[in-house]
Every structure is written in structure tokens, then in C-alpha cells.
């Protein structure tokens, strides 16, 4: 129980709260772990402590650990495995720890879906499902849904007496299609599956529209909207109070005070009615009458103050007017009539959803496939049964799991949904006060509501649990951040203390939620957080809204490029924890975070123009790639050659190679009919002499096309694709174009996608093309195949969602002026987990439509949830930075925006007014008003502290706030008219007259010789091994670079693979063993065998490599004098990688190029030992020596010294440069014969 917690050890690295999270038990525990607070380390330590404790240790397979991703589950297993191995070192005889290591692989450490799969596999006989089922591909799932839905609607259209269905169709479809109705059915199906009992949720949705015998006060929508009415009236009241304050200033329009006070009285009456009922507000709204403002002579008063007073009063009147128009222009009973009228239609809609769900499940069952929601619901079906009162209760299987699991630990709990919560509930104990559920997460980082994650589950427990755990569950706050500098944390806290609250934001950013400094950094320069606001003037914007967006992306990209280049060129210093020192910033240290990726291509282009290497994992552009587009058109033509546009595209492409004139000639042969019919007719006749070339091209293609069409009917799609690649030569052709490897990779991806498609339940080319269309309709373009890896030294661009869990020294958060995506709020129908279904009232006979109460309530609720989600997304973005945070946004009229943001300066509390926070349309609407209350904004505003409380104005954060003129970032228009004419002449292949002033320049360029020709035949980066070979070669390095380009050696055929490992593979295996051998244990055959087995288990060695290792030779080394020195050394480092700069003359014997040139050398040192009198370098060799030299080892020794002298000299030089200590001895150790060779200079 709680009283028996172990005390935190002396000198422990854990904070008090972390230790509490590690050892607390006896009830359900919720750990609210802030960004960078070490939650994974805490979770692993808790598991380890449970496994290794002396009293009642728990077997690892009696713990259920639920992670958010498979990668996180694997990392968790690895960490636990490493921790157990460390424990085993201290107590090698512990059978319990050995048992845990053997149980680890089958322990329940996985995603919730993997756990569901485990339950279903074990109890499939309780379900109507084939035990050999497979997980459905997402696109395959969508196509199946489409098929099922088409069949259902076709049946409904065929029923004669089906008036309610046709009423539904009339209301929710257009003249052209019933796509909207299909979308409604699919959306309701998806939303229902996010609930433990989908049918029950659907039934409640219909019940909400059954208003027989009810008043408007009984409707949940009305009660919710009344709260919103109060909110808007409070906002209006604040505007009038502020206007009154301004009017009463010495230079304010005092005559208007009387009118403003009457306004306050009117708003007070409305607010009083809102505290009553809907009807009372309706009646009060009918009597609203605003007094006319008294005329004043504006010159007698401060004109700006008068404008401000009038503006605030107009805002207040607009708030009331909006309420009148949206909610109180109709009598309450008319809203009830809407519900009555829509009830039978909605009932029919829900019936269709239920039929669809039943049929869809049946077809998946027939095809032996399930999707991820099926996994959750099937698992829940096994774990639950219905009680007498109709509620769900644990089944016998669930009780078995309860007995099995000593504790259930859930990572990223804030991203759990209702179904997953039910599954977890059924395998854990009933009562929170005696529970065994341990949950870790941060609701401030819950950013997956679009995946139906429910942050309310976390929030409910956080509010309910106490820090003492009295009477229920316990909550523990981990607020210390071990990732970021003080400036990043203080800057983030300063913003979120002002914008995140329970009413707007769903959680209070209080003292417990604030980020607290846990990391230590050396003093740094220029580490203040920054806000750069770009002013985009109207003149700079072209092509309307779309042009403005492109312009914003370009402006922000240029500003970021300037900053990145400046920071890299100046050697801006960042802290490197590995070396515990400051180092110059590299491109890999930068990340650019975006809310979504539409701007990414423009930003990439701008950065590349500035010479900045950049990488973005774009999920778009694949099907737009020219080579993919052409191939897709080929397949469309194979499927149906009567399609003119695809066929014309193929004929015009390099595959056939017709030019515009030839295409026109072909069309002229038949003005009617399709291109294909014209082509067929043209090929049947005898061509004119001038048309012979055209005839030959078309004949070649026509024969291929007929062959492909026949092949497509009989063979697999993937074989067809490869056949087309080969017979057209197009795959080889694109390989010769610029970015050829990328293009070929794209074509291979298309082939792979066809293979994936063929693994589904669909077949054939037509279905494949439909499959691809569905991908594009869903917006799931795949992105081009990767040509640049994520580990390169490049600036990364990614979405904020992708960055979650990552950290970077320098973070740019861009696009902060882009509007929030509110498209979901504009749909014809809305769905909500609590409020169900809402849509416009549509009367097709009268041709009228208007907003309903349910639609207004759901829209308001979804808007507030969207605002809360966007706050959490911003929090994730800001907390990725370790050392430097730079925020960038663009506005069209900075002065106008600043005037709006300055409203916040008058507010006297930390949390900004609700209407400012709820009315935000972009991130800048939160960030700028917050920063305008900080002293560091004075560099921009020069307004003084005013009424801002000192604790806010003087808050310890450091900020730089700057407005950047967009016109200063735009490059001048390129190129003079003369140059343009020259380019056009060259493009048209016309002779260019050479004027005398250009003559010398042209000749110089034509006769130019590259000044570093020798460098082209020598690599700028070499490995030590390559340099060694260069010195051994009689030819030196002449043409060595060209030799590297020879065709790669093919993989050994399978019939040769059985003959064992190559010498190189054996050597690699021995080096791996020497790297991992535990020097603290006695080096015996048993210990080495156990170690090799562990390495095989971890996939560090293959079984074949393990069998080939001569253990006795490893033992011989440690029995030798040199091996004993290794065991006795002060410190031992193995497999030490290094890079260093070396002069080209040292690296290449034949270097004739410029003196002073350097090359980058890289290598790995096998072993270095530090003894009392210095450092010794050891290189292990597996060369075969015995029997190869007639004179034995004495004859071999000079040859071996000569062979490896250069290599070890370079190793020694690298060590001496990095360690600043001389290497006293360089040794070669040969396992064959147990020989040691000392290398002398």
C-alpha cells in the first residue's frame, strides 16, 4: 500500500515527483508528464522496480504496457532488456532476472491494437471470425465501403413505397449525385465505431430528435447555447465598460457616458434573462432598443479616443445583433417543429447506417479481413457481456486477464478513445481507490482529436484524482523539463499562462502545469526567444488569396533562410551533451515546424536557392511526378484506349515521341471519333511519304498496346507494369534524366504499390486505377520516393504533429499568421460525440433552408474544441526547442492587427479575456497579445507599462519582437531586357550576333579550363582502409576514383550461400564479439557462449556468424599479455569512430593538385586502452597467417607491418588530435596464431 513506498536513495538522479511516480502503488495513478519531463524513463524504471524488488517481484509477462506506436513499444522492450542485463551483471546468479529476460519477448508490451489482436487470436472461437483473418488495407477498405453503400442505395431506390427515403434523398443530395448522402452514412458509421456501443449511440442520436411533449428548455442544445449566450453578453458588457472608462478620461467624449450607462443597463437585463430560461431571453431580445449616441463636436475631444469608444460600442451591439439573428429571431416552438419534422428522416438515415454496418462487417468476414476498429470492438466483445440492466460488465475472459495482470500501464493516455478506455477498464480492477492502472501522458499535448482521441478522459481523471490519493485515484505532476534552456521554458510559460484556461482551452495552465527548469546549459549568446512578424502590403500580393498565400510562404522562407545562413556562417554555438561542450551549429540542428505541409515545397525551394540543404517528408507530389503521370496514362490507355486525353498524353510523351505537328496531322485524318479510332484507321491505310515517320512511330506503339491489353487480361498487374517499363525502355530513359535515381525510385514505388494492391481482395487493371483514384480523392498522395535520408546534415521541415516526441536545438515555428482550418464547421451536416447530429433544416418543396438549434450548438461546441486543440498543437511546437525558439508569422496590415492585439494590454489578470482567446483565428492572435504585455515588446511599441501588472510586464522571459517589412525580403526583378532577348534567341536556336564588348568574355568562357582538374579524380572523403590500399597499390591512386564506379558485385546465388561465410563476414562477426564482450566478467567459454546467444537474440549476429566464431581464439587473446593489459587498463574504448581532416598530399601519393587542399578521413578504431603511462591503440586482424608463409610468422611480420603501418599511423594521429595526448604504442593482434605486431614509426 501507499505507506510502504521505498525511500528515494541518497544521491538519486530522480526528482521527488519522478520517484513518487516510480514507486507509488495501491490505487489508480495518473501521471501528468509535461514536455521533456522524462516520462519514458520513469515508466521503464517503474517496470524494472516491480520486476526486481525483493518482496513479491512481478514477472514481466504479468504486466500489460500499452504504448501509442509500435516503435515506442520496441524501444520500451529494449530499455527494459538493457536495464535487466545491467542488473544481471551485478548478480549473475539471479535465476529470476534470467527468467525475465526470457519472458521479455512475449511480454504484453505493445500498442492497444496489438493487445486486441492477441486477445482475438486467443479467443477467436467466441466471435464469428476466421482465425486466419488479415488486417485490411485502408484503400481496400474504402473501396469495399463504396461497393456496399452503392448496393444498399440501389436497393432503396428500387423500393416503390419508400417515401421517407426519398425525403432523405431530396433533403441531402444534389441534382447531380447522392454523394452527400453517402458521406453522411459513412461519417455516422465512423463516428459510431468510436463508441463502445455503436448502436446505442446511434439510437440516442435519433432519440434527441423525438421532442413529443417537450419544451425547448428540455433540449440539451438549448441549455448549452444558453451558456454561450451568457458568454457573448459578458463580452458585450466588457466592451461597454471599457468604452465607458475611455469616455471618462480627461480628453474622452464625456457626453457619451450617459448612453453607455444605458447600454450597460440593457445588457444587464439581457444577462439576467439568460440566467433564467430560453423563453425569457427570447422575450427580452424582442425588446432590445439601443439609445442614439449624443452628437458631439469631435474636435473638442481626442479623436483617437472617440473612435475607440465608438468602435467598442459597435462591437457590443454586433454581439447582441448576432444573438438576435442566429437564435432569437424565431419563436422557441418553431425550433421544436424542426426536430419533429426531421425526426423520421433521421430515423431512416440511422437505419441505413445500421444496415451498412451489418453488410460491411459481413463482406469483411467473407473476405477474411478486419480493420483496426474491428480489432477494438472484437476485443471488447470478448472482454464484456451485458448485465441485466443492459449495461456492459466484465466477461469471464476479462476476469482472467484481471487476475493475470498485476498492473496495467498506459503511455500517452491523453490520446486514448472511448473504446480503448473500455478495454482497459475491463482488464483492470474496479475501484480507483484500490486500482492497478498506471496512466502517463500530457493532456496539453493531446493533438489527435481528428483520430477520435478523447482528451476529456484524461481531464476527467485529472480533476477527480488528488495528489494524496485520498478517496480515489492519485495524480502526480512531472513539471520539470530536462530538454530546454530557461529562455525556451520561460517564453512558453509566458504565452500559455495567458492563453490556456479551462473555459477556453479545456485545462488551466496553473502552477502545476507550468514548465520548470530541469536541464543545465552553459551560458549562451542570443538565446532569447523571438517573434518575427512580417508585414505584407497589398502591392506585394498578386493573384488574389491564393497568390497571397504563396507570397507569405516565400517571405517567411526567405527570412528563415537568412537567419539560418547567418547563424551557420557566424558559428552560432549550441550545446552538445555528448561532449559536454559548445559547438558550432549545423544544418541538422534546425527544424522548421508547420501546422500542415502546403507551404513546404515553396520553403524548400527558397532554402535550396540560398544553398541550404533541406529535407521534408512530403506526402504529396508522387502522382504529380512526370514519370509517374505518364505511366498512369499508359495504364489508363491499356484499360480503355478510347480515352482521348490519356492517349494524347502518351503519344506526346517520350515513349512515342510525337510532336505537336504530328499530333495535329493524326487528328486531321479523322475529325470525328476518338484518337484511338483515328490512329487505327490511319495505320490501316498507306501513309504519304512525309507521314512515314509518324506511321512508323504509331505502328510500333499500336503493336505494343495490343500486346499489353492481351497480357493484362491474363497476367498479374505487377508483371504488366514491369513489362511496360522494359518494352518501352522508359525506366532506363528516366534514369538518364536529371534526378534519374529519384525518377526510377518513383517508378519502382508504382510497381510496389501494384504488388500491395494485388495482396488485397481486388484484382485487375480497372480496379487498380479506381484504387489510385480513391487514394487521390482522399488526399493521400504518397510523396515522391526518398532520395535524401533523414540523418543527413540538412534543415528539416515537418508538421508539428510529426515533431511530437522529438527535440531540436533551434526551432522555427512558421506560418503563425495562417488561419485555423475551420472547414469541418462549414459542412452541411455536423456530428459530435455528445450532441449527435446537426444539419440545416431543408424543405425541398418550399426551397428553403435555415440553421437549426442542433447545428448551432454542435458548431459552437466544435469551435471551442478546435480552439483547445490548436492551443495544444502550439504548445507541442514551442516545447520542441532545446536552445533557441523563433516564431514567424505574416500579416497583411501590421498596424491594423497591432491595434486589435493591443486590447490585451489593458487587462489586469494573467489569463487574457475569454473573448480574445476564443475569437482567435490564427496563432498570432494568441502570441502577439501575450507578448505585447511583456517589457521586451517596448522595443516595438514604446507605450510603457501602463496598467499591466508588474508580475506580467517584468516576467523573467526574454523575447525579441520585431516587425519585418515584406518588401525588404523580396528580391529585385531579375534580368535586363537584353539578357531576356538573348535567352529567347538561344531557345529558338537562332544565331546570336556577337558584339565586340562581349567577344572576349565569350571566348574566355568557351576556352575555360577547370582549375582543380586533379581533384576530380580523387575523392574528397576517404576511409582509412582506402588510403591504406592506395599506398599498397603500385599505381598509387591514379584512376582509383574511376575504378570505384565499376559494376557492383552481384549477391551470391542461393546455391552458393550454403558454403558458409566469406572471410570478410567472419571478420565482422569476430569484431562484433570483441566490441560487446563484458570485460567485468571472467572470460570463459560459458560466458562467451551466453554473450553470443544474447547478440543473436538482439540480431547483432546471425546464427551463421555465431556458429563460425572460434571462441577459443577470443579466449587466447585475453590470456595473452596484451589481453591481460586490456583487462587491467584504467579505461577501455572499443569501436571508436572518428573523422579528421588530412592534407591531400598525405592521403594521395600521386597528388598534383593545389597545395593545402584537405580531404575528410573517416575510420573506426577497434580498441584503445588507457594505462598509467599512456594510450595504446590495438587493431584486431582475422587474416589467415598460419601456413601461408613458408618461413612462418617471422617471414610474415615485415609484410604485415608494411601492410598496416599507414592505417595505424592515421588511427594514432586521429586519437592524438582528439584526446590531446600522445599514443605510446600501436599494436596489431592476429587471432590466427595469437601473434602481436608492434608498429614503429
Swiss-Prot record:
Family to which the UniProt record says this protein belongs: Belongs to the helicase family. AddA subfamily.
Name of the gene this protein is made from: addA
Record's keyword annotation contains Isomerase: yes
Protein name, as recorded: ATP-dependent helicase/nuclease subunit A
UniProt cross-references to InterPro entries, sorted A to Z: AddA, DNA_helicase_UvrD-like_C, DNA_helicase_UvrD/REP, P-loop_NTPase, PDDEXK-like_dom_sf, PDDEXK_AddAB-type, Restrct_endonuc-II-like, UvrD-like_ATP-bd
The organism's taxonomic lineage, starting at the top: Bacteria, Bacillati, Bacillota, Bacilli, Bacillales
Alphabetic keyword roster: ATP-binding, DNA damage, DNA repair, DNA-binding, Exonuclease, Helicase, Hydrolase, Isomerase, Nuclease, Nucleotide-binding
Role this protein plays: The heterodimer acts as both an ATP-dependent DNA helicase and an ATP-dependent, dual-direction single-stranded exonuclease. Recognizes the chi site generating a DNA molecule suitable for the initiation of homologous recombination. The AddA nuclease domain is required for chi fragment generation; this subunit has the helicase and 3' -> 5' nuclease activities.
Pfam families reported in the protein's UniProt record: PDDEXK_1, UvrD-helicase, UvrD_C
One GO biological process term: double-strand break repair via homologous recombination
Binding site for ATP: 33-40
Domain UvrD-like helicase ATP-binding: 12-485
Keyword set includes Nucleotide-binding: yes
Domain of life: Bacteria
GO cellular component: cytosol; DNA helicase complex
Species for this entry: Bacillus mycoides (strain KBAB4) (Bacillus weihenstephanensis)
Start and end residues of each UvrD-like helicase C-terminal domain: 505-805
Family annotation (NCBIfam families): addA_Gpos
GO molecular function, a single term: 3'-5' DNA helicase activity
Classification via CDD domains: SF1_C_UvrD (cd18807)
Amino acid at each position: 500500500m501507499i505507506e510502504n513506498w521505498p525511500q528515494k536513495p541518497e544521491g538519486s538522479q530522480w526528482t521527488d515527483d519522478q520517484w513518487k511516480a516510480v514507486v507509488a502503488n495501491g490505487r489508480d495513478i495518473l501521471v501528468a508528464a509535461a514536455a521533456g519531463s522524462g516520462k519514458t524513463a520513469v515508466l521503464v524504471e517503474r517496470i524494472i522496480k516491480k520486476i526486481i524488488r525483493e518482496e513479491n517481484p512481478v514477472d514481466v509477462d504479468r504486466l500489460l504496457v500499452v504504448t501509442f506506436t509500435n516503435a515506442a513499444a520496441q524501444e520500451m522492450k529494449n530499455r527494459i532488456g538493457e536495464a535487466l542485463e545491467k542488473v544481471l551483471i551485478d548478480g549473475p546468479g539471479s535465476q529470476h532476472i534470467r527468467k525475465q529476460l526470457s519472458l521479455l519477448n512475449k511480454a504484453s508490451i505493445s500498442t492497444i491494437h496489438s493487445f486486441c489482436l492477441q486477445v482475438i487470436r486467443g479467443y477467436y472461437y467466441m466471435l464469428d471470425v476466421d482465425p486466419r483473418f488479415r488486417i485490411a488495407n485502408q484503400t481496400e477498405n474504402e473501396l469495399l465501403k463504396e461497393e456496399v453503400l452503392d448496393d444498399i442505395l440501389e436497393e432503396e431506390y428500387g423500393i416503390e413505397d419508400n417515401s421517407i427515403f426519398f425525403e432523405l434523398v431530396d433533403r441531402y443530395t444534389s441534382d447531380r449525385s447522392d454523394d452527400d448522402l453517402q458521406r453522411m452514412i459513412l461519417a455516422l458509421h465512423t463516428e459510431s465505431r468510436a463508441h463502445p456501443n455503436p448502436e446505442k449511440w446511434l439510437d440516442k442520436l435519433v432519440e434527441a430528435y423525438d421532442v413529443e411533449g417537450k419544451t425547448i428548455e428540455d433540449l440539451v442544445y438549448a441549455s448549452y447555447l444558453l451558456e454561450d449566450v451568457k458568454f457573448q453578453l459578458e463580452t458585450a458588457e466588457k466592451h461597454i465598460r471599457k468604452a465607458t472608462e475611455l469616455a471618462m478620461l480627461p480628453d474622452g467624449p464625456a457626453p457619451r457616458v450617459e448612453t453607455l450607462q444605458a447600454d450597460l443597463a440593457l445588457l444587464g437585463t439581457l444577462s439576467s434573462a439568460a440566467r433564467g430560461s430560453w423563453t425569457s431571453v427570447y422575450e427580452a431580445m424582442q425588446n432590445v432598443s439601443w439609445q442614439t449616441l449624443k452628437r458631439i463636436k469631435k474636435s473638442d475631444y481626442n479623436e483617437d479616443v472617440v473612435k475607440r469608444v465608438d468602435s467598442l460600442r459597435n462591437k457590443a451591439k454586433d454581439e447582441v445583433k448576432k444573438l438576435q439573428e442566429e437564435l432569437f429571431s424565431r419563436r422557441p416552438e418553431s425550433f421544436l417543429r424542426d426536430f419533429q419534422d426531421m425526426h423520421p428522416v433521421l430515423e431512416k438515415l440511422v437505419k441505413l447506417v445500421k444496415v451498412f454496418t451489418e453488410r460491411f462487417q459481413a463482406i469483411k468476414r467473407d473476405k477474411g479481413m478486419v480493420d483496426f476498429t474491428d480489432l477494438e470492438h472484437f476485443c471488447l466483445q470478448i472482454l464484456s457481456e451485458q448485465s441485466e440492466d443492459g449495461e456492459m460488465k466484465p466477461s469471464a475472459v476479462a476476469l482472467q486477464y484481471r487476475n493475470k495482470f498485476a498492473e496495467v500501464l498506459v503511455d500517452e493516455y491523453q490520446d486514448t478513445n472511448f473504446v480503448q478506455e473500455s478495454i482497459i477498464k475491463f482488464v483492470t480492477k474496479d475501484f480507483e481507490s484500490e486500482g492497478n492502472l498506471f496512466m502517463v501522458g500530457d493532456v496539453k499535448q493531446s493533438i489527435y482529436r481528428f483520430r477520435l482521441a478523447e482528451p476529456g478522459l484524461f481531464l476527467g481523471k485529472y480533476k477527480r484524482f488528488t495528489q494524496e490519493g485520498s478517496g480515489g485515484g492519485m495524480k502526480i505532476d512531472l513539471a520539470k523539463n530536462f530538454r530546454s534552456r530557461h529562455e525556451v521554458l520561460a517564453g512558453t510559460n509566458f504565452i500559455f499562462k495567458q492563453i490556456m484556461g479551462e473555459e477556453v482551452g479545456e485545462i488551466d495552465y496553473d502552477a502545476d502545469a507550468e514548465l520548470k527548469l530541469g536541464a543545465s546549459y552553459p551560458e549562451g549568446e542570443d538565446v532569447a526567444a523571438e517573434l518575427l512578424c512580417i508585414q505584407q502590403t497589398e502591392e506585394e500580393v498578386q493573384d488574389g488569396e491564393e497568390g497571397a498565400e504563396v507570397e507569405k510562404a516565400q517571405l517567411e522562407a526567405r527570412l528563415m533562410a537568412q537567419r539560418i545562413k547567418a547563424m551557420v556562417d557566424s558559428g552560432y554555438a549550441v550545446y552538445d551533451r555528448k561532449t559536454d561542450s559548445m559547438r558550432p551549429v549545423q544544418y541538422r540542428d534546425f527544424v522548421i515546424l508547420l501546422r500542415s505541409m502546403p507551404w513546404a515545397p515553396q520553403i524548400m525551394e527558397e532554402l535550396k536557392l540560398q544553398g541550404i540543404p533541406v529535407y521534408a517528408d512530403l506526402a504529396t507530389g508522387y502522382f504529380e511526378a512526370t514519370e509517374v503521370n505518364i505511366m498512369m496514362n499508359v495504364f489508363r490507355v491499356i484499360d480503355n484506349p478510347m480515352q482521348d486525353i490519356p492517349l494524347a498524353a502518351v503519344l506526346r510523351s517520350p515513349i512515342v515521341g510525337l510532336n505537336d505537328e504530328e499530333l495535329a496531322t493524326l487528328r486531321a485524318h479523322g475529325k470525328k471519333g476518338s484518337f484511338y479510332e483515328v490512329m487505327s484507321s490511319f495505320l490501316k491505310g498507306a501513309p504519304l511519304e512525309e507521314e512515314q515517320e509518324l506511321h512508323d512511330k504509331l505502328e510500333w506503339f499500336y503493336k505494343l498496346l495490343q500486346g499489353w491489353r492481351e497480357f493484362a487480361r491474363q497476367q498479374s498487374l505487377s508483371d504488366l507494369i514491369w513489362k511496360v517499363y522494359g518494352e518501352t525502355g522508359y525506366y532506363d530513359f528516366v534514369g538518364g534524366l536529371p534526378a534519374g535515381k529519384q525518377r526510377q525510385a518513383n517508378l519502382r514505388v508504382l510497381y510496389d504499390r501494384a504488388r500491395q494492391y494485388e495482396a488485397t481482395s481486388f484484382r485487375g487493371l480497372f480496379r487498380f486505377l479506381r484504387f489510385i483514384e480513391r487514394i487521390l480523392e482522399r488526399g493521400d498522395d504518397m510523396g515522391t520516393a526518398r532520395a535524401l535520408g533523414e540523418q543527413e546534415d540538412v534543415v528539416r521541415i515537418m508538421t508539428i504533429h510529426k515533431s511530437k516526441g522529438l527535440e531540436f536545438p533551434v526551432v522555427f515555428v512558421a506560418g503563425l499568421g495562417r488561419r485555423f482550418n475551420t472547414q469541418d464547421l462549414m459542412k452541411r451536416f455536423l456530428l459530435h460525440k455528445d450532441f449527435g447530429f446537426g444539419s440545416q433544416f431543408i424543405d425541398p418543396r418550399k426551397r428553403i433552408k435555415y440553421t437549426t438549434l442542433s447545428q448551432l450548438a454542435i458548431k459552437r461546441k466544435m469551435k471551442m474544441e478546435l480552439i483547445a486543440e490548436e492551443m495544444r498543437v502550439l504548445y507541442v511546437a514551442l516545447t520542441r526547442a532545446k536552445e533557441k525558439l523563433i516564431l514567424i508569422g505574416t500579416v497583411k496590415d501590421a498596424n491594423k492587427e497591432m491595434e486589435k492585439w493591443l486590447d490585451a494590454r489593458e487587462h489586469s489578470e494573467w489569463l487574457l479575456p475569454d473573448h480574445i482567446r476564443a475569437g482567435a483565428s490564427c496563432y498570432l492572435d494568441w502570441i502577439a497579445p501575450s507578448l505585447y504585455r511583456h517589457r521586451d515588446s517596448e522595443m516595438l511599441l514604446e507605450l510603457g507599462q501602463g496598467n499591466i501588472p508588474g508580475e506580467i510586464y517584468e516576467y523573467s522571459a526574454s523575447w525579441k519582437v520585431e516587425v519585418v517589412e515584406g518588401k525588404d525580403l523580396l528580391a529585385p526583378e531579375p534580368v535586363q531586357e537584353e539578357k531576356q532577348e538573348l535567352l529567347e534567341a538561344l531557345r529558338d536556336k537562332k544565331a546570336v550576333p556577337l558584339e565586340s564588348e562581349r567577344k572576349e568574355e565569350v571566348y574566355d568562357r568557351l576556352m575555360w579550363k577547370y582549375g582543380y582538374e586533379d581533384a576530380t579524380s580523387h575523392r574528397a572523403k576517404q576511409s582509412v582502409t582506402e588510403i591504406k590500399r592506395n599506398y599498397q597499390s603500385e599505381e598509387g591512386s591514379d584512376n582509383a576514383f574511376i575504378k570505384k564506379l565499376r559494376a557492383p558485385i552481384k549477391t551470391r546465388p542461393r546455391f552458393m550461400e550454403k558454403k558458409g561465410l566469406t572471410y570478410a563476414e567472419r571478420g565482422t562477426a569476430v569484431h562484433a564479439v570483441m566490441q560487446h564482450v563484458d570485460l567485468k566478467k571472467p572470460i570463459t567459454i560459458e560466458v562467451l557462449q551466453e554473450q553470443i546467444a544474447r547478440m543473436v537474440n538482439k540480431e547483432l549476429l546471425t546464427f551463421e556468424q555465431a556458429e563460425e566464431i572460434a571462441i577459443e581464439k577470443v579466449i587466447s587473446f585475453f590470456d595473452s599479455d596484451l589481453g591481460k593489459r586490456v583487462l587491467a587498463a584504467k579505461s577501455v574504448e572499443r569501436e571508436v569512430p572518428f573523422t579528421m581532416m588530412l592534407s591531400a598530399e598525405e592521403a594521395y601519393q600521386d597528388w598534383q593538385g593545389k597545395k593545402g587542399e584537405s580531404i575528410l578521413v573517416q575510420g573506426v578504431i577497434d580498441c584503445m586502452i588507457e594505462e598509467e603511462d599512456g594510450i595504446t591503440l590495438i587493431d584486431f586482424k582475422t587474416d589467415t597467417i598460419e601456413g601461408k608463409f613458408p618461413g612462418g610468422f617471422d617471414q610474415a611480420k615485415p609484410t604485415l607491418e608494411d601492410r598496416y603501418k599507414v592505417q595505424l599511423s592515421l588511427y594514432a594521429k586521429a586519437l592524438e588530435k582528439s584526446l590531446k595526448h600522445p599514443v605510446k604504442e600501436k599494436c596489431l593482434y592476429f587471432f590466427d596464431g595469437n601473434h602481436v605486431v608492434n608498429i614503429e614509426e
